[in-house]
From Swiss-Prot:
Stated name of the protein: D-alanine--D-alanine ligase
Enzyme class: ligase
Alphabetized GO MF terms: ATP binding; D-alanine-D-alanine ligase activity; metal ion binding
Designated gene of the protein: ddl
Family statement: Belongs to the D-alanine--D-alanine ligase family.
Native source organism of the sequence: Lactobacillus acidophilus (strain ATCC 700396 / NCK56 / N2 / NCFM)
Amino acid sequence: MTKKIQVGLIFGGNSSEYEVSIVSGHNIYKAIDKDKFDVHPIWITNEGYFASEEESFKVLEDPSYQVENPHKVNNISNIIELKNLPEIDVFFPIVHGNLGEDGVLQGLFRLMNKPFVGDDVLAAAATMDKEFTKILAQRVGVPVADWISIKRFEYDDKNNDKLNYEKVAEKLGHDMFVKPSNQGSSVGVNHVTNAEEYAAALEEAFKYDDKVLVEETVPGTEVETAVLGNDKPIVAGVGQITNAKGSFYTYENKYDDNSTSKLQIPADLPQDIVDTVRENARKVYEITECSGMARIDSMLTPDGKVVLTEVNALPGFTNISMYPKLFEEAGIPYTELITRLIQAGMDRFDHKKTLLHKHD
């Protein structure tokens, strides 16, 4: 009998996307091929505590479960030891948001010399920062929404022109979006059309990050595609999102099973538009050096222009998440998708072992 691969499934975390991570972890655990993998859940509570494996299993069964015996992680050695767990062959992090998909957790895995699913350190950090993603996308000719960035020190200077709605509107128009540069799932994002809304949106966004982006509003329909793999990635088809409320795709729209947003897979679009969405996704995936997986989001304008909005290098695996749905439509069912993601992480690790790290 082939020995099963021991998977450390890490979920939760001190993040604004904690609930999404719990649901994603639950779904991955239910769908993973139990004939190939033994799963060892590692639950990080929203307060930053590590729960026991027993309690981690409980929250996978019931996402509302509260930890009874948390272990506060005071230093890195406590995490690296991962006491009371068997030897982990590969980690599957599904910790969304800050510390989970920004390169921090990935760096820890590198220190531990363990394979892991998803982006390596550089790509995780670059795609978490929306401004860096835009700069890299422009490098390969992929259109992005025009923007300005505001750092914390600029926000603290109340005479800074970037805080003046009318002056910013001269560049971006009066219809804008304000968003934290290093958050996902529309957390802290607001649509503004006047000075009062602008001031309130900046205050809200700076609760989540020390850098905030102000973007022009790009009219149109949100379209998404999904990418799987390392050096020769597979790009899935294209999905289309329609929000019945007539507003942008909010955190609740993305993850609530009762969301009013409608997901159409495949999108009812001309083939040339589909080809552009997919080719742009491939270009962005490669220039950001993504590996494993990513969901690439864009806006399709009324005149047929495809404008990149976000690279989500650790997409959700909730009941309504677009990433697994797009690959299911492409002929890769949920269980096989998880297997391929794990294999991609292990393949990258095996390759890195062949590289020299010192001069002979």
